[in-house]
Regions:
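Ferredoxin-like alpha/beta domains used as RNA- or RNAP-binding modules
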Residues: 1-106, 133-207
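Beta-rich strand-turn-strand
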Residues: 109-112
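Short, well-ordered loop/turn sites that connect or cap secondary structure elements
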Residues: 118-119, 138
C-alpha cells in the first residue's frame, strides 16, 4: 500500500525545505511546488518576520529533519555549548552521529523516519552487538551492519538496490555487498548538506 506523504510535504513547505532533504522524491508529493527556497528569498522572508519567529522556525526545521522532540533537542544544545568549538556546529554534528541518521546516510532506508523504525525493531548491530536506540551516538571505528537474522528480509535488498546511487558522506564507508558500514571520522560541518542556519538556533537559546 502506498504511503501518504502529503503531511511531510506540507510540513516541508511550511518550513521552506525540499522533501528531498527528508529522503522523499518530489514526485511523491503533489503539494510540493518543486522550487527550493534560495538564500535571497529566505533573507526577504526573514525581514518580514520577527527575529524570534525566524529563529524559532530554524529550530523547528532541524527538529523536523532529524525527528527529535524538544526535550531531547535541548539536551543536544546544552551539550553542544559545553563542547569546544562552535555550538551550532556541535549541535548538528551530534544529530548527524545518531544511529538512525547513519542508517539513513548509508542508504539502508530512504528516510530518517523509516530508518528510525528499523533501529527500534532491532535490525542493526554496532561492532557486532545489537543496538535498538535511534539516538545512539556513533564514533570513528564503529561498524554498523544489518543483524544476521535480518539480512534475508526483502526490504533491505530492495532499499539497497533503490539507493544504489545514494551518495555516502565522506565520514562514512559502505560495503554494499556485505551490507556493512563504518564510521571513519567525526563529521565536520561542511559534510552536513542541510539548508539550515544553526547560528539562529544558538541565538534563540541564548536569550
Amino acid at each position: 500500500m502506498a504511503k501518504n506523504r502529503e503531511p511531510i510535504a506540507k510540513h516541508c513547505k511550511a518550513l521552506g525545505i525540499s522533501p528531498a532533504v527528508m529522503g522523499y522524491n518530489h514526485d511523491n508529493s503533489r503539494s510540493w511546488s518543486g522550487k527550493v527556497t534560495n538564500r535571497n528569498a529566505q533573507a526577504q522572508t526573514r525581514r518580514k518576520k520577527s527575529e524570534y519567529a525566524t529563529q524559532l522556525q530554524e529550530k523547528q526545521k532541524v527538529k523536523f529533519i532529524y525527528g527529535v522532540l524538544e526535550k531531547q533537542f535541548l539536551g543536544y544544545y546544552e551539550k553542544a555549548v559545553r563542547m569546544p568549538g562552535k555550538a551550532g556546529d556541535n549541535l548538528l554534528i551530534q544529530l548527524e552521529r545518531r544511529l538512525d541518521n547513519v542508517v539513513f546516510r548509508l542508504g539502508f532506508d530512504a528516510t530518517r523516519r523509516e530508518a528510525r523504525q528499523l533501529v527500534n525493531h532491532g535490525h542493526f548491530t554496532v561492532n557486532g552487538r545489537k543496538v535498538n536506540i535511534p539516538s545512539y551516538q556513533v564514533k570513528p571505528g564503529m561498524v554498523i551492519a544489518i543483524k544476521e537474522s535480518s539480512r534475508s528480509i526483502e526490504r533491505f535488498k530492495a532499499n539497497l538496490e533503490a539507493n544504489a546511487y545514494h551518495v555516502i558522506p565522506k565520514w562514512l564507508d559502505f560495503d554494499a555487498n556485505n551490507m556493512v558500514g563504518k564510521v571513519v571520522a567525526v563529521p565536520a560541518r561542511e559534510d552536513i548538506d542541510l539548508p539550515v542556519e544553526e547560528h539562529l538556533i544558538v541565538e534563540l537559546y541564548s536569550k
